[in-house]
Amino acid sequence: YKTVFVPRLETCDVIITQGFTGHTKDGKTTTLGREGSDYSAGILAFCTNAEDVTIWKDVPGMLNADPKWFDDTIKLDQISFKEAIELSYYGASVIHPKTVKPLQNKNIPLYVKSFIQPNEPGTVIQASTEMDSLIPSFIFKMKQVLFSFTTKDFSFIVERNISDIFDLLHKHKMKVNLIQNSAISFSVCMDDDYNNFQNLLEDLKDKF
């Protein structure tokens, strides 16, 4: 970007470029996946030390819940980078969590606005804000499976047991969305889109 992009910025008022594309380690062209264009904007903003970034969506901004499942949702006028990453990581599809990280690194504000109502303020994502603690947010996730583990000898679920469980979850490439533990049990909630649950159970059956 230093040899191609930055020199153009010095001679042009506006640069139009594509997003969503990248390349593999061996140089082959590929795509960045869901919301890859937003991620591209975050990377370019980081590289050029942009004052701010605006992403245009078909929604008025980031909401505290999905309006498909919840009535009376509230638009979040401003939230912190941390809150935005949490919401997007666990299911809020307006932005991708990777979009936020390069902006957070240089404290570049991110505006999420509606192209249907372009004059509305939308949501600004920036450094820590008091609004995070005032409005609760809700994530609805479908197709979830719940696993509950108890040691065979009813011994306490301590750090060693939890570490063993997560080692196996990592081995089978399973992503945990929610955890809960008590004295003798440990539960995890995961997406129900893996084909190797039985293999996981086989690895766990000797101890749990």
Language-model features and meaning:
Residues 1-208:
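C-terminal catalytic "cap/lid" subdomain
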